[in-house]
């Protein structure tokens, strides 16, 4: 039976991000889990929750499964997945437009702007930060129709300011919270060619850190699990998994 799949969503989101993306994996026989990160479900609060909290929850879920899973993370969830991968045995690790770990510098002006703009909110690391439609439209949902963007944004929830600070301002973090240790699982990193918030040049650095295969999806942007072309991205993941399994047989 194929290995189970655990899907990890990014900032401001929930497991619903993968409603379509999970379908090809289920059709291939995988049991798929797409949990909400801590505080992201109904009635939850993300204030004060850090990246290590998210990662420990995901690692615990992975270790509780009957066999090592395929762990797939998108955006900030890609960084959560990297951290979890150092604490749980995995069949494979797949990162979709991942936030980079500690030590990987951004390669675009947009990355720098997103990191510094949060300081306009004051001590944002103590708060849960509300999603911003203009930013979501510009950086994440830019290839979707207005109706699709509005529908996705309506489901977004506040994100932990602490987790955002640890992710976007890692060079100011004396605890090196998002430093990723050795990952033994085979890894694949995908980047959207039009992504400006986690562009290919940044994602490639992450892949090099992991010794991972790296692929650019030329026509895609940041919302890989749900924007046009998501099905091709899922197929690429499944093809890579199949080739890995065949090589190991």
Model-derived regions, located:
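Conserved alpha/beta-hydrolase
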Residues: 25-44
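Catalytic active-site module of serine/aspartate enzymes centered on a nucleophile-bearing elbow/loop
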Residues: 213-249
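Active-site glycine-rich loops that stabilize anionic/oxyanionic intermediates
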Residues: 10-13, 75, 193-194
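Gly/Ala-rich beta-loop-alpha elbow adjacent to hydrolase catalytic centers
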Residues: 72-77, 81
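Conserved alpha/beta-hydrolase "acid-adjacent" motif
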Residues: 196-202
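Flexible "cap/lid" loop of the alpha/beta hydrolase fold
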Residues: 89-124, 163-170
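Active-site loop/oxyanion-hole signature of alpha/beta-hydrolase fold enzymes
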Residues: 39-69
């Amino acid at each position: 039976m194929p290995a189970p799949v655990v899907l990890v969503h990014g900032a401001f989101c929930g497991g619903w991000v993968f409603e379509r993306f999970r379908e090809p994996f289920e059709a291939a026989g995988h049991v798929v889990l797409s949990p909400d990160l801590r505080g992201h479900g109904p009635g939850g609060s993300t204030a004060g929750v850090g990246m290590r909290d998210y990662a420990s929850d995901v690692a615990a879920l992975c270790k509780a499964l009957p066999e090592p899973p395929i762990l797939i993370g998108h955006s900030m969830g890609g960084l959560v997945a990297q951290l979890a991968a150092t604490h749980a045995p995995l069949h494979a690790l797949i990162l979709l437009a991942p936030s980079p770990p500690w030590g990987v510098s951004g390669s675009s002006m947009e990355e720098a702007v997103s990191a510094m703009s949060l300081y306009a909110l004051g001590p944002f690391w103590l708060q849960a930060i509300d999603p911003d439609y203009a930013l979501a439209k510009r950086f994440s949902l830019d290839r979707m129709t207005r109706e699709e963007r509005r529908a996705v944004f309506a489901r977004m929830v506040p994100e932990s300011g602490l987790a955002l600070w640890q992710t976007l301002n890692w060079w100011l973090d004396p605890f090196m919270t998002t430093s990723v240790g050795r990952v033994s699982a085979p890894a694949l990193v995908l980047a959207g060619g039009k992504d400006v918030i986690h562009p290919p040049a940044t994602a490639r650095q992450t892949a090099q850190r992991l010794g991972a295969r790296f692929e650019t999806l030329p026509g895609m942007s940041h919302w890989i699990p749900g924007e046009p072309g998501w099905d091709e991205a899922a197929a690429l993941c499944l093809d890579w998994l199949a080739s890995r399994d065949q090589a190991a047989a």
